[in-house]
């Protein structure tokens, strides 16, 4: 089992939670990004730098992740691909992706794209709240416990 992080877009506060979790769970944590990242020294934490470009990091995560792994991403198409491989996917707000939530999110993305194409300003997501961080940490622990039961 490995935790993969779509690190270019992952908030720093979530990365900090993941660093502590990797140590506690003694699980490999791999942060994939197209830029250099600073991570704490650990035998469990490493970075994987990929070339800059559209979906390069996403494609590398899909290529390397396996069934039973966890992928941290806010990217819906990436989440859909890793679910197909048998991995779990969790967004930085602590929402666990499923086939149903992926379909719902893709529909919403299409709708928002239509609004933006019509020159409607839609804004971006809200900043992460302390509640979001707590929810993420709780869902991460829940995934860990579920994966331990399957062993």
Swiss-Prot record:
User: Record's Pfam families?
Assistant: DUF188
Disulfide bonds, paired cysteine numbers? none
What family is it from?
Belongs to the UPF0178 family.
The protein in question is named UPF0178 protein YaiI
Lineage start: Bacteria, Pseudomonadati, Pseudomonadota, Gammaproteobacteria, Enterobacterales
UniProt lists the gene as yaiI
